[in-house]
Amino acid sequence: YFRKLVSNFIVNSQEDKTFELADGSLLTDPSTGTNASAPDASDDVAVFTNTLPNNGEDATVDGFELALQHTFDNGFGVLANGTIVDSDAELDPFDINQVFALTGLSDSYNLVAFYETDDYQIRLAYNWRDEFVQSLTQGQGDGPTIVESYQQLDISGSYSVTDNVEIFFEGINLTEEFVHKRGRFSNHLLLVEDSGRRWAF
């Protein structure tokens, strides 16, 4: 069991800033070297959305971590670990005025099966992570960015040809899972990332 007390956690927030176009500098036409346009006092005010880092509120994080590992006599083994977290600074999707929530917090667990000898080893790993708040802002405007729950299956192995030569391979995301990012609710899709299955030798 663990408890973390967080203070002055840095979060990004967005606010609108106005800019008087009439106060801008002259635009020079590079082909002629003359002013292509001049500011006009009647120009409309331009509004820009600025993303700024701010000190967040205090928060408390409680959680449990558990890890188990066992190796059998024949070289096979298993490893499992998991984390469960809870915080008093979680995102409320119905509160559009909320300016603080801890980012990156979520439950997760990993399961690994392996086989090892003096000459070679192979590992199969399954990883799962629950959805979490990545950011309280979006590039498209107001609202949080949430990464939905994700699972991944990986494999790796190696063979020692000699004391100085080893052959290695690794396969990432064997089941070709997608990463989904959304806004406040599940129908607010922001991004689908397909990194595909990847191999390295």
Predicted region positions:
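C-terminal regions of RecA-like/P-loop NTPase motor modules
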Residues: 13-19
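Membrane-spanning beta-strands of outer-membrane beta-barrel proteins
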Residues: 59-61, 106, 150-151, 196-198
